[in-house]
Amino acid sequence: MYKRQIERAQQILCLLKEMSEEGSLPKDAKVFLDSPMAKKVTNVYKKWSELLSKHCQKFKNHPFEFPQLKLVKDVEESKKINDIERGCVIIAGSGMCTGGRILHHFKHRIWNPRNTVLFVGYQAKGTLGRKIIEGEKYIRIYHEDIIVKSKIVTINGFSAHADQKELISWMQEFDKLDRIFLIHGEYDKQVIFKSVIKNIMDKKAHIVEMKEKIYI
């Protein structure tokens, strides 16, 4: 499973904790959090657990601790995960699969049709993650071409970005809105959103190009 280290990893751990308590996560399953940064961030979340959402505070024990979870200590321990043949969950980064320990796990597992690669975040154009979800048959890792035979699944519900409806609602809160600039997102999505802004708000939006100068 690919993930981002800050917040996304903790959301996933919270859900797995819930599954563990409900019994839908097998007791003999192993869940590996294999990311130094995610591990450090999780410790920060633990320190300030009273500030977590009500959903995360409902558990009997800490939301980021459950019997199946193993926090991977170092690179050597990460490599030992390759010896596991039974079902397990590996949570690793980096964000869009452009580096980090996820590459190591891809090399050893993405060629196997018994495995599933689960994406829980956006993959930008040109990244390895985007190539995988678009059906690339071979990916290059550590100067080696690896065939992709694993099942590829994407869950979009973890996005931290506001959706189209939320952005429109936010803009409608302003008493005076003279100019709207679209600076984030893929171009085809920006074109659609520009049209939505015109239809709903009767406002013109400008799609900003790379290195374009805007004078206010």
Label each region the model flagged.
Residues 3-216:
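Acidic/His-rich, metal-assisted hydrolase cores and their charged scaffolds
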